[in-house]
Amino acid sequence: MSAVNSPKPHPAPELGDMKESEFRRFGHELIDWIADYFENIDQLPVLPNMEPGDLKAQLPSVPPEHGESMENIIADVDRLIAPALTHWSHPSFFAYFATSTSGPGILGELLSAAFDNKSMLWRTSPASTELEEVVLDW
């Protein structure tokens, strides 16, 4: 195939469906939201004051035709989702088992989500496999 007929390289796609500048902005906003959540968690009720179906009644019965803005999604988390949670990291939550939430763990999950490695065997993720082998031998 000649160079004239060669497909032209496409620029790298944006990060998912979001521009990098938006990712940075909303990433910072969510980190701040999470930090505020943990800073003020002791002021929240451990258990939500609701009955089965209360949240469902506030959610749309059909999927949206178009995606919502991150501003609206974060507002929905703040207004609808967080108040409907059992707050396992609350200092007065003593049921089931101890929570394993930690700042370093959350940041580690963020890295894990960004790498999106499927660590099922060495070929799919040499770093994950070898790191796991070392840590398990400790």
Where do the PLM segments sit?
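N-terminal entrance/gating region of PLP-dependent enzymes' catalytic architecture
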Residues: 2-138
